[in-house]
Amino acid sequence: CSSDLTQKPILDEEGHMILREEYYLDGLNCDPFSFASECQELNSYYHKNKNFNEIKSHHYIISFDPKDRDECGLTGERAQQLGLTFAKKNFPGHQALVCTHTDGHNESGNIHVHIVINSLRKYDIPQEPYMEFDCEAKAGYKHHLSTAYLTHLKQEVIDMCKKKDYIRLICSLLLKEKSQKKNIGHNAGDRKSSMN
């Protein structure tokens, strides 16, 4: 595993990579342990994401305040279920990894859910109101994050948390668009959209 902020591996005192103490991992439309190869197969099938500088995946983070754990009873397992429900509803037809861990950055204790989707849709879905183009609902086309889509995602997170009384949600769904080998976006780093 790696630190969320630096993306550097977490190492033990001997320099060996270690897993986080508590994490949950699921795949949608893929096996979580073969996500990368399954995405590459789909990309090859549709002849997409062949160039180095193309965006291969999108990374969303739903982060909860530590008080949601302490005062509202949020657990890593419950956050994972919320993340899975959110991903199924908001990224249908995409291959996705949903991973939750409970230690937060620098062991802050804030539970957060990572959702990483293949930039290419695997299955056709019904057209959604936030989609700008008809092709966005079709298999083989790339994920397009419009202003309307981002607004929709923000509201979905807020509604999900209000429904469960996680009112202290740190409302920051971060978007990281990554290529396989380097980050692409603003300031030569990750492109992020804050949900505040």
Give the location of each predicted region.
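N-terminal nicking endonuclease/strand-transfer module with a His-rich metal-binding environment
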Residues: C1-N196
